[in-house]
């Protein structure tokens, strides 16, 4: 190792001296000790300076790449503490080390090539430094480009910015939002496993008021649905079923009216059936908040609300039909009374007779009109009888008592109305006293503005002074 390094040092020294232009004669002259001439470089420099200057010239000639490799070789071959070791062992060791270094270099280059191949080409750096300097927004570059090229470049820049933004968003993780360091300082909260305690109430001992309160808190819509169920069932029983019986008997002709009655009847029954199902769920303590029956109830409620407009229009006719049916039932139960007087036919009866001449007129409608006329005639007769009886009672009745008899005041003196209320009496007394006081003593008037004369004028005969006592 020592011999090899010495040989390399001698070779380098010879190369440096050859490049510096020194020969053996120059060395001999130096050895003779003759003084150098002023034009010679040795006049200002010694051998050490010449050596370093020659070495720097050689370095500049070779280039920076060779300089770095040379410096590395020099650093490696610099000997500090020499050891007496055979050159053969050193050469074997160096050869093995060189092989290992070569293998390491091959492995590192293969790993580096694989890493470079796995990198996305869009993320790699460019080959020209000019790409990362200057700008295309200047007036010089814009003047040399057409409007179409400028718009194309702007569009490409916008697309590139969007791609970068998406890539950065995909690379974000939970740690990037800065929540982890906050959680690190958070104090751990001890979790206590609490046993679930269920309080069983004896409903037999709870009052009705408390039960209603609990029911309203648990399901406030339950009471409203129960009331709605009762109302709809009553309407079905008292109104819709009798009208449908008239439709079946033929009293009400088939048409839109009968179809409307059937639709309303079926709608009410379905609505009541869904409410009953909801009540069954509540009785079995099944949670019904997410059950489909709630949605079905809302649908039926909306349809019923839409029918309310039609119900208002047809309410008078439905009431008339129901009263007509009640009158017909009563008429069947009581025998017909013979009419003693013959009266002219009414307009409705004449219209009914006229309608019988039409071939398409239904006999059920004619029967309905006749029943309605008979009922109105009976009602008119009852009103006449009641009016005659009332007139007879008024003729035989006694005279009514007078106001004086009813009040029975006797010789009570007349009193003012204001005396009945002491508060109002004293209030009125105070108001009159203030008026009298205003005439006796002048009110204090503050000088909000400069004096401009008497507002009401000055009367010489008026004296408002107070007498001394």
UniProtKB/Swiss-Prot annotation:
Phosphoserine carried by residues: 37, 146
Tissue distribution: Detected mainly in subsets of neuronal cells of the brain. In the 17.5 dpc embryo, mainly expressed in the olfactory bulb and cerebral cortex. Postnatally, additionally expressed in the cerebellar cortex, most strongly in the hippocampus.
Disulfide bond residue pairs: none
GO cellular component annotations of the record: nucleolus; nucleus; small-subunit processome
InterPro entries per the UniProt record, alphabetical: Sas10/Utp3/C1D, Sas10_C_dom
Covalent link location (Glycyl lysine isopeptide (Lys-Gly) (interchain with G-Cter in SUMO2)): 140
Family label: Belongs to the SAS10 family.
Name the UniProt record assigns to this protein: Something about silencing protein 10
Annotated organism of origin: Mus musculus
Gene: Utp3
